[in-house]
Amino acid sequence: MRGVLRGLAVVVEDVEFGRRLYKEGFYGRFLGYDKVKREEVDRINAPLVLALYEALYLVERGVLEVVTDSGEKITQTRLVELGREKLKNFDEIYKIYKYFRDLGYVVKSGLKFGALFSVYEKGPGIDHAPMVVVFLEPDKGISATDITRGGRLGHSVKKTFTLATVLKNTGEVILLGFSWARL
């Protein structure tokens, strides 16, 4: 099945295929809808919009083919190049996304929490995301104020505030989580 590259997103216009992707892993978001519960998916009649990193993940697994508006296939290599051209730190962000997905988590945008990702154990509408992930650029420090801000954010939304980065020399994903505790 295919999706069409449109700017920074890949649009799955086949509604049935979009529903299947969403049901199987909560990939993307339906155009015009916010959080959709699994039991509501069959009532949705809208295209599914995937972020570039989601589309790349599905392309790597042979689940999705990405094409241009004219139907020309975009290779996996070209999709990575486009990600690098359009998004700062695309490689690192994708590695973090892939890291959580490969562990079986559902990874959604964390924008409403001021974060890169919200990470669910089961999925939106089933459980609450126990973790918000903020990207820490490689070779960039973090201040005590940033940590305090993150801890407050995590506490206010009752989630673990997690810093994620990718080591330049090894490509390893490194996580550092903060949770509030009563002492």
Curated annotation (Swiss-Prot):
Any single biological process term in GO: tRNA splicing, via endonucleolytic cleavage and ligation
Keyword Phosphoprotein: no
Pfam families: tRNA_int_endo, tRNA_int_endo_N
Molecular function GO labels: lyase activity; nucleic acid binding; tRNA-intron endonuclease activity
First-level EC class: lyase
Catalysed reactions, semicolon-separated: pretRNA = a 3'-half-tRNA molecule with a 5'-OH end + a 5'-half-tRNA molecule with a 2',3'-cyclic phosphate end + an intron with a 2',3'-cyclic phosphate and a 5'-hydroxyl terminus
Family from the record: Belongs to the tRNA-intron endonuclease family. Archaeal short subfamily.
Function recorded in the entry: Endonuclease that removes tRNA introns. Cleaves pre-tRNA at the 5'- and 3'-splice sites to release the intron. The products are an intron and two tRNA half-molecules bearing 2',3' cyclic phosphate and 5'-OH termini. Recognizes a pseudosymmetric substrate in which 2 bulged loops of 3 bases are separated by a stem of 4 bp.
Name of this chain's protein: tRNA-splicing endonuclease
Organism: Pyrobaculum arsenaticum (strain DSM 13514 / JCM 11321 / PZ6)
